[in-house]
Amino acid sequence: MEDTVIDEYAHFATQIARDAGAILRDRFGQPHEVHYKGTIDMVTEADQAAEALIVSRLRDAYGSHLLLCEEGSRGTVEESPYRWVVDPLDGTTNFAHGMPTFAVSIALEEAGQPIIGVVYDPMRDELFVSQRGGGATLNGEKLRVSATDRLISSILVTGFSYDFGRRARQADTWRDFLTRVQAIRQTGSAALNLCYIAAGRLDGYWERGISPWDVAAGALMVLEAGGAVTDMGGGPYHSDDREILASNGTLHGDLLHVIAAHEDASVANAELGS
């Protein structure tokens, strides 16, 4: 694909991400109608309004492309090399509880490979953009992963499954890392976790039970900023996997070593995350 075409897609995605983000920002802190997709997995009318805007714009502009969206919208075209992967509100739990850490995430894949990723944090007005072979930026400034080369100096981030039994198993890995690193964070937004690695704010991220819309845009961000993204066994990463390990690259082997002592491939089919 020509660079000019990728530029066009990226520009379009940034515009709709900003517009969807404005919906979230305007509704943040207001009373919400909350529905539960599971015991603790929620969706608000803000998710639905932001997704409706994104889906409408994408269908009008690129009606032949496939769509994969968190809140249920799907494309009708069975065969297309292009797929938009959208999370209109990554961090719904934060949003619903009045915590200002959430984002709009939009990715475009060609033949299963990401070619653009856009993540917009409307509360901080931070726009992360990546293009295949073109690097990653934050508000127009080039991003580069951290140079951290020791676990004890690193800050990691993770997330936990909505399944309580699975959380107990995940906690074993968390406890092991906790004795080896400077700190572990949990932001509640997979998309921002990955963008923060790309920006050098965090050094590594692992999680099982995630969905394509959680990580498709952010994974490209990490790669284009010089980092590494694999599955949790060190194999090739695909957005339809339900697991991810991302890092600044330098620490990737150390992270894999710790995870291997705790993670069993049999739990790779964890339920979809937020």
Model-derived segments and spans:
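Residue-level signal for inorganic ion chemistry
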Residues: 24, 47, 58, 92, ...
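Short secondary-structure boundary/capping segments
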Residues: 34, 59, 74-77, 119, ...
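N-terminal subdomain of lithium-sensitive/metallo-dependent phosphomonoesterases centered on the IMPase/IPPase/PAP
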Residues: 1-89, 250, 264-274
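DPxDG-like acidic metal-binding loop motif
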Residues: 78-137, 152
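Acidic active-site catalytic centers that drive phospho-/nucleotidyl reactions
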Residues: 41, 47, 51, 70-71, ...
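Small-residue (primarily alanine) positions within well-ordered alpha-helices
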Residues: 13, 17-20, 50, 117, ...
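An extended, acidic
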Residues: 144-274
